[in-house]
Amino acid sequence: MSVIFETHAHYEDEAFDEDRDELIKSLPESGIGYVVNVGSSIATCHRTVELIKHYDYMYGALGIHPGEIHEVTDDDMKWIETEAKTNPKIVSVGEIGLDYYWMESSKEEQKKFFKAQIELAKKLDMPIIVHDRDAHGDTLDILRETKPKGVVHCFSGSKEMAREIIKLGMYIGLNGVVTFNNARKSLEVAKEIPIERL
């Protein structure tokens, strides 16, 4: 039987409070052999570190989502760096990137913070998990400039953008949108991506 590696989960979320342990323990029976739980705020990063202690098959990613950067201190970022350096179960920096839909912080602040987190990932020799919402051009420009390892999660860009990301050696994550009846664009993009880059 093949084993699924779930690369992007948020089991620390309060939506799982009632049955989190039961659900996570059932994952191996469902064919899910490994899970990366992804932090997106300083609070969810702390919860991720606590959560992954309890399951051998669960790993963590620590990073600050663009909608949360206004809440983060220098001490928080030092904690993330130290935890990523010293905890062998931290495997990635994410979820990081740009979000021009919600605009919790200015575009310039988001770009600066995105680049800083990419530099942290490179210093740690870790891949990144990229969040890109309504910011395709700037996201691609920063990825071209910094050339990190990683995945653009929940990809919503064009097939041309997908080709560029693949040229950079990165991966593309697609979500359930590709199953929707009106998901023509997502399906066209999916056809362009080599299976080894999904």
What residue ranges belong to the model's regions?
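Mid-domain alpha/beta scaffold segments of enzyme catalytic cores
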Residues: M1-L198
